[in-house]
Amino acid sequence: MGGRVDHEYSYLFKMVLIGDSGVGKSNILSRFTRNHFSLDSKSTIGVEFATKSLQMEGKTIKAQIWDTAGQERYRAITSAYYRGAVGALLVYDITKRQSFDNVHRWLRELRDHADSSIVIMMVGNKSDLIHLRAVSEDEGKALAEKEGLFFLETSAMEAVNVEEAFQTIITEVYGIVNRKALAAKEAAAASAPLPSQGKTISIDSAAGNTKRACCSA
């Protein structure tokens, strides 16, 4: 999950936005990466992506976020779209019940095509349209808990919880990467062969010892 690529950043995390057309995926993306919102945002044609770099524990994390329209005619790009993704925002519109009902289908598609360890944040977007709400926050929380997903309601228009949604995924993925790196290091240390003629030397061995142990990096 993620990897070092060049000196400009320590890790590159690919993330995908999924959900029905019209739920506000493109505005969530533009709000996070450019702090921009457009009321006239049109449905995305094909695929586009944007990037944003964040600092975490002294390391630069570059998030590469892919966005595609939710219409059925773009199903052909599914495999390439999900390949290599370490995080996903599954977005529905709190004012459109159908978009919430379709979360199950999107989740199934995501799990069919993405890595099993992908971190998923379910997002109920357009929380500013409270007077038009068709899906309660409790319903969203309950479904997310049942499926083992993170959950937030957002407003791309009012910039509410958009940063938090991405930050949660990035923090979780970063933690997974670190745990895997530590596990790999411990496994390598455990399987390292012992020196053929060496002996165990404690750290408080006499300074006068002339025989030294050879250590592997």
Curated annotation (Swiss-Prot):
Keyword Iron assigned: no
Membrane topology, from the record: Lipid-anchor
Binding annotation for GTP: 19-26, 67-71, 125-128
Lipid sites, type S-geranylgeranyl cysteine: 214-215
GO MF annotation list: GTP binding; GTPase activity
Matches recorded under InterPro entries: P-loop_NTPase (IPR027417), Rab_GTPases_membrane_traffic (IPR050209), Small_GTP-bd (IPR005225), Small_GTPase (IPR001806)
GO cellular component, one term: Golgi apparatus
Domain of life: Eukaryota
Keywords: Cell membrane, GTP-binding, Lipoprotein, Membrane, Nucleotide-binding, Prenylation
Keyword GTP-binding among UniProt keywords: yes
SMART domains on file: RAB (SM00175), RAN (SM00176), RAS (SM00173), RHO (SM00174)
Compartment(s): Cell membrane
Family affiliation: Belongs to the small GTPase superfamily. Rab family.
Name of the protein: Ras-related protein RGP2
Organism: Oryza sativa subsp. japonica
Gene that encodes it: RGP2
